[in-house]
Design a protein with these regions (language model features):
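Short, high-confidence coil segments that cap the C-terminus of an alpha-helix
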Residues: 29, 84-85
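Conserved catalytic-core motifs of GNAT/GCN5-like acyltransferases
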Residues: 91, 109-125
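Short beta-strand micro-motifs in enzyme catalytic cores
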Residues: 30-32, 54, 121-127
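Conserved beta-strand-loop-alpha-helix junction that forms the acyl-donor binding cleft
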Residues: 89-101, 117-118
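Conserved acetyl-CoA binding element of GNAT-fold acetyltransferases
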Residues: 49-63, 91
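Short amphipathic alpha-helix that is part of the acyltransferase structural core
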Residues: 1-21
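Conserved acetyl-CoA-binding loop-helix of GNAT-fold acetyltransferases
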Residues: 65-81, 101, 105
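Conserved beta-strand in the GNAT
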Residues: 33, 38-48, 55
Length: 142
């Protein structure tokens, strides 16, 4: 199992996603390792799902979740500086409240909920922001 799968399959991360199915490495994604004060704490990643549209996600171990906002904002700065992304999306299962709060905390706007999105069981709330909305959020906050 590679490091990405090790994080994605950590019991505390599985508990909040995909009905406990775990995570498989996807070669089409661009992954970034997260370290806080020298300690490995998780992964952030994106996948270009449409031209210039990135589906973005984070998998943090519990001990670094207190830094999640700073990590998320640094990730936005990185992709805005190093790519031409025009839209970002993300989603969080209804049962994973931390994921929903995280999306709002880093400047994404709630788009809506799709019922039974994960395996016909879990409802999932989707979030998005344009490049301009992210830049404005980074410059001014809410």
């Amino acid at each position: 199992m590679n490091g990405i799968e090790a994080v994605g399959n950590h019991p505390d991360i599985i508990a909040g996603s995909n009905n406990g199915d775990g995570y498989d490495y996807k070669p089409e994604c661009r992954y970034f390792e997260v370290n806080v004060h020298g300690q490995f704490g998780g992964i952030v990643y994106y996948q270009e799902i449409q031209p210039l549209t990135f589906d973005c996600h984070a998998m943090y171990l519990p001990e670094i979740r207190g830094f999640s906002k700073e990590i998320g904002l640094a990730f936005w700065r990185y992709i805005l500086t190093n790519t031409t992304v025009q839209c970002v999306t993300s989603f969080a299962a209804r049962k994973f409240r931390h994921g929903q709060m995280y999306c709002a905390m880093i400047g994404l706007k709630r788009v809506g909920t799709i019922k039974k999105y994960f395996k016909g069981v879990d409802d999932v709330t989707f979030y998005s922001a344009t490049r301009e909305e992210l830049i404005d959020f980074l410059n001014h906050g809410r």
